[in-house]
């Protein structure tokens, strides 16, 4: 899963670079759209709703207090050790924020906290340039 993490970081850097050339029309402005993909079971501890809600309140909301969206998902990935496809429930957190260099550090802190707390191999991270308004 280290390859997935490295790929996510590269995508994030490309997304931040792409945001520098994106032109938005008023009232929208250049922003970063971030998706965090959290597995909730296989390969790590099962993450029930109570544990998820606590993690959201303690780790994610304080880092992005202006707002975010949480969706339930169903994910799958190939286990590099066993080669089989594993399916698991997941949570997708969508965050839209102004371009801000420290955003990557906040995202990495969230991913590392989740992996540590729930013994997960990885957290998917997608960062892309977007035009947004609220």
Task: Describe each PLM feature range.
Residues 18-71:
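N-terminal secretory signal peptides
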């Amino acid at each position: 899963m280290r390859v997935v993490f490295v790929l996510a970081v590269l995508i994030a850097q490309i997304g931040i670079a792409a945001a520098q050339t994106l032109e938005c029309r008023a009232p929208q402005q250049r922003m970063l759209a971030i998706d965090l993909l959290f597995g909730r079971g296989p390969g790590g501890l099962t993450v029930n709703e109570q544990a998820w809600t606590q993690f959201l309140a303690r780790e994610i909301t304080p880092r992005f207090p202006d707002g975010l969206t949480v969706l339930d998902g169903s994910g799958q990935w190939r286990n590099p050790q066993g080669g089989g496809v594993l399916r698991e429930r997941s949570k997708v957190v969508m965050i839209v924020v102004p371009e801000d260099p420290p955003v990557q550090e906040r995202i990495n802190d969230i991913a590392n906290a989740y992996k540590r707390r729930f013994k997960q191999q990885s957290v998917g991270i997608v960062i892309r340039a977007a035009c947004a308004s609220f």
